[in-house]
From Swiss-Prot:
<feature type="glycosylation site" description="N-linked (GlcNAc...) asparagine">
    <location>
        <position position="4"/>
    </location>
</feature>
<feature type="topological domain" description="Lumenal">
    <location>
        <begin position="162"/>
        <end position="175"/>
    </location>
</feature>
<feature type="transmembrane region" description="Helical; Name=3">
    <location>
        <begin position="90"/>
        <end position="110"/>
    </location>
</feature>
<feature type="transmembrane region" description="Helical; Name=1">
    <location>
        <begin position="32"/>
        <end position="52"/>
    </location>
</feature>
<feature type="topological domain" description="Lumenal">
    <location>
        <begin position="1"/>
        <end position="31"/>
    </location>
</feature>
<dbReference type="GO" id="GO:0046850">
    <property type="term" value="P:regulation of bone remodeling"/>
</dbReference>
<comment type="similarity">
    <text>Belongs to the GPR137 family.</text>
</comment>
<keyword id="KW-0812">Transmembrane</keyword>
<dbReference type="InterPro" id="IPR029723">
    <property type="entry name" value="GPR137"/>
</dbReference>
<feature type="transmembrane region" description="Helical; Name=4">
    <location>
        <begin position="141"/>
        <end position="161"/>
    </location>
</feature>
<keyword id="KW-0325">Glycoprotein</keyword>
<protein>
    <recommendedName>
        <fullName>Integral membrane protein GPR137</fullName>
    </recommendedName>
</protein>
<feature type="transmembrane region" description="Helical; Name=2">
    <location>
        <begin position="61"/>
        <end position="81"/>
    </location>
</feature>
<dbReference type="GO" id="GO:0030278">
    <property type="term" value="P:regulation of ossification"/>
</dbReference>
<dbReference type="GO" id="GO:0005765">
    <property type="term" value="C:lysosomal membrane"/>
</dbReference>
<keyword id="KW-0458">Lysosome</keyword>
<feature type="glycosylation site" description="N-linked (GlcNAc...) asparagine">
    <location>
        <position position="257"/>
    </location>
</feature>
Length: 395
């Protein structure tokens, strides 16, 4: 064997693409990054319990998905320290869990964010047009259907490719077209929902303000998601278009030239390992880290000076986003409260997140008056004057 190789290729040319020390350093760097994200999300889940936030909410489900995603990616890269051949030749179930399932979890987190903000927008519109509330079921069904379609396509493609029952190029083409189209659509939907939440002030932007997030930050995060996932789709399609159908080795990236996951069964080379890590960093670790940072758990205020007062009730800044998500389905009032407010006393049940509606003519030129919600809400004094909730009412 040695004589045949020496006759074909000079001995000096038989060197690895990357030195072993570089490969080991890359493995340590990849594992450390994913492990740091894992412990960061794990700590935030403990903060939910420590601060007394709602245990089952959009926020906790989102963090749990990110925790599982980071755990699977950390486990995958830990194989490459000593057991690289085993990582490249896994059985169908371990292969799907380590390579394919993290991509599905990432898509589920994206659809979860879309679902929540879409509900916020629909509930804001339903105040003026009650028939809009019927469309909320259609929105939920659409996102659930998209998640199931994404999961089904990825599972089938992974199983068929591992059993060699279909052409790898055809499977990759189907998966890339479906998966990346859904990623781009959901990213555009998330950006649109964030813009609507920010623009429909004050009825919806209260969520961003109470969260401590500005409109610019929300728009920047949405724009970053669109750019990242759109570039991901373009990269995948370009890799497939430039690769021959018989062997997918375009750009010398071996079978990791498609960024979603590995569907072919060739061994992972050193150059492919380097590019695989960079791809996961740009198109998986970076967007997930941005979302985790944007929806992180906040510490509630400990004193009344940093709390908000609404109709005599004191609310901390933790009444934001996902901590009160149960209000959407557990009977919290989203209806308009009618009648004049004559004092700062009252109950939360007679108001809504979006403020109250009074019957004082002359303000805004109509028969109804609409107060701004939560942080900027006002009540009527005895003389018909408006007094800010941050000032002492006149007696």
């Amino acid at each position: 064997m040695e004589s045949n190789l020496s006759g074909l290729v000079p001995a000096a040319g038989l060197v690895p693409a990357l030195p072993p020390a570089v490969t080991l350093g890359l493995t340590a760097a990849y594992t450390t990054l994913y492990a740091l994200l894992f412990f960061s999300v794990y700590a935030q889940l403990w903060l939910v319990l420590l601060y007394g936030h709602k245990r089952l909410s959009y926020q906790t489900v989102f963090l749990a998905l990110c925790l599982l995603w980071a755990a699977l990616r950390t486990t995958l890269f830990s194989f490459y320290f000593r057991d690289t051949p085993r990582a490249n030749h896994l059985g169908p179930l371990p292969f799907w869990l380590l390579y394919c399932c993290p991509v599905c979890l990432q898509f589920f987190t994206l659809t979860l964010m879309n679902l929540y903000f879409a509900q916020v927008v629909f509930k804001a519109k339903a105040k003026r047009r009650p028939e809009m509330s019927r469309g909320l079921l259609a929105v939920r069904g659409a996102f659930v259907g998209a998640s199931l379609l994404f999961l089904l396509v990825n599972v089938l493609c992974a199983m068929l490719s591992r059993r060699r029952r279909a052409q790898p190029w055809a499977l990759l083409l189907v998966r890339v077209l479906v998966s990346d189209s859904l990623f781009v659509i959901c990213a555009l939907s998330l950006a649109a929902c964030l813009c609507l939440v920010a623009r429909r002030a004050p009825s919806t932007s209260i969520y961003l303000e109470a969260k401590g997030t500005s409109v610019c930050q929300a728009a920047a995060m949405g724009g970053a998601m669109v750019l990242l996932y759109a570039s991901r789709a373009c990269y995948n399609l370009a890799a497939l278009a430039l690769a021959p159908r018989s062997r997918l080795d375009a750009f010398d990236y071996d079978w990791y030239n498609v960024s979603d996951q590995a569907d072919l069964v060739n061994d992972l080379g050193n150059k492919g390992y380097l590019v695989f890590g960079l791809i996961l960093f740009v198109w998986e670790l970076l967007p997930t880290t941005l979302l985790v940072g944007f929806f992180r758990v906040h510490r509630p205020p400990q004193d009344l000076s940093t709390s908000r007062i609404l109709n005599g009730q004191v609310f901390g800044s933790r009444s934001y986003f996902f901590d009160r998500a149960h209000c959407e389905d557990e009977g919290c009032s989203w209806e308009h409260s009618r009648g004049e407010s004559t004092s700062m006393s009252g109950s939360l049940g007679s108001s809504s997140w979006y403020g109250t509606i009074g019957r004082e003519p002359g303000w805004c030129g109509g028969s109804q008056t609409r107060t701004t919600p939560l942080l900027f809400s006002q009540v009527l004094g005895p003389g018909g004057h408006h007094h800010s909730l941050y000032s002492t009412p006149q007696t």
